[in-house]
Amino acid sequence: HPLIAGSIGPTSMLPSLGNISFDDMAAAYTEQMSALLDAGVDIFQIETCQDLLQIKCALYAAESLFKARGSRCPVVVSVTLEPSGNMLVGSDISAITAALEPYDFIDVLSINCATGPLEMVRHVAHLAEYWPRAVGVMPNAGLPENVDGKPFYRMTPEEFASFHKRFVTEYGVNVIGGCCGTRPEHLAEVVRQVSSLKPAPRQVKKQAMAASLFSGVSLRQNPAPALIGERTNANGARQFRDLLEAEDFA
């Protein structure tokens, strides 16, 4: 049967900027998520996220609710990256993956809204390379234009679907869809072009990361540091002193 995802939005507040406290936002999310579960949704879709702290708050509410009820549903987290390549508060895709990877109950990490599929390619490529679980992408139908004072999305269903075909066959994307500007015709064409395809296998690179609000940093140094041990001491190691005196540096 079709799966019903309950949409859980970013609210109008950014906790990283002090617009709302963590506890108040968590309480609001808990109330919404409880209502969604009572209504019978199959999936939590925490989407259009623009602040890592807001995501963590929603995940805290979801995990607390799952523990209280003794059961859980799949969780999708979908972030919004502006044309600059960053979330609204400045986080880039490396910060997102580094900060969210420890939350092992995130089933899908996705990108949605703000831009069209073309602008999302480099971010999808990063997720395909570094995110260890399922990847999703739900772009707009291109970037909006102002036509007679109204937003107009020019991307055709065929163009839109061709990007999704690429996402699946080149980057191994598992979940696809559409956001602003997409119409039934866009999604029908996506189904026509993509429904028979299997996601390409991914070779995910595992690496230890640390992250600020803005970017992620690998903890692996290249080149690696040279470790100098106690035996490389001319006073305490006669063999080492003899090698130095013989200028044997091999």
Q: Where would I find each of the regions flagged by the language model?
A:
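Domain-level signal for soluble alpha/beta catalytic cores
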Residues: 1-250
